[in-house]
């Protein structure tokens, strides 16, 4: 990864793998054994079809634009039209998956691309943050790409509340929501703990 080894530091360069070894048992494979429906939406560095890691459904890959058309690979898997925003469409797909699997346990792995190139915020959010961006010369636009819904990242609190209030879903007592950050530091600081 380009980082020189230094005896006085606790971080050392990690061996890079091109994909997860087949003998590794994944969380999704374990969940499927226990009757869970599993889905992977968004950014994934798996190098192989996510279904080979235990996902029932997957909509993954790179985007050329956050506005429709996103890229050719999404034409069949993520229906969209002119003006649609990629982050919102992935969130809609996740909500649809939850609705379709409301009568069984499910696992949704949703990773938005929003903080990766190309940096293209939703137009209404770009306008909202224009004044603040003037004071941010080193980072042009991180806040408007991290706010895909009015209340925050991924599925908003309002959407979760709507899901809880729908008696037909009956998932509110069994739901677990994990917010996780992808650890992807700048290359100059990459490595792993001893």
Name every feature range the model reports, one short phrase each.
Residues 19-23, 40-41, 89-90:
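Short, glycine/acidic-rich beta->alpha junctions
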Residues 39-42, 49, 107-111:
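Outer-envelope exported proteins of Gram-negative bacteria
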Residues 44-45, 63:
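Residue-level "edge-of-site" marker
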Residues 3-4, 58, 62-194:
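Active-site-proximal cap/lid insertion segments
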Residues 26, 45, 93:
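Short Gly/charged-rich anion-binding patches and loops
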Residues 1-26, 30-36, 50-53, 57-72:
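Active-site segment of extracytoplasmic enzymes that catalyze sulfate/phosphate-ester chemistry
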Residues 41-44, 178-179:
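Residue-level detector of functional hotspots within protein domains
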Residues 46-49, 117:
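Active-site environment of divalent metal-dependent phosphoester hydrolases
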């Amino acid at each position: 990864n380009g980082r020189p080894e230094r005896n006085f530091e606790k971080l050392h360069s990690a061996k890079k793998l091109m994909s997860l070894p087949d003998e590794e048992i994944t969380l999704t494979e374990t969940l499927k054994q226990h009757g869970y429906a599993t889905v992977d939406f968004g950014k994934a560095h798996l190098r192989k079809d996510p279904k080979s890691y235990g996902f029932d459904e997957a909509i993954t890959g790179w985007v050329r634009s956050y506005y429709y058309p996103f890229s050719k690979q999404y034409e069949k898997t993520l229906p969209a039209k002119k003006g649609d925003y990629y982050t919102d469409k992935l969130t809609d797909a996740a909500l649809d998956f939850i609705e379709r699997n409301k009568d069984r346990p499910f696992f949704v792995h949703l990773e938005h691309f929003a903080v990766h190139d190309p940096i293209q915020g939703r137009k209404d959010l770009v306008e909202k943050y224009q004044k603040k961006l003037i004071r941010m010369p080193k980072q042009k636009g991180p806040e408007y790409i991290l706010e895909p819904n009015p209340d925050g990242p991924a599925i908003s609190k309002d959407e979760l509340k709507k899901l809880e209030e729908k008696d037909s879903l009956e998932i509110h007592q069994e739901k677990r929501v994990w917010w996780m950050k992808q650890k992807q530091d700048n290359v100059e600081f990459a490595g792993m703990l001893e």
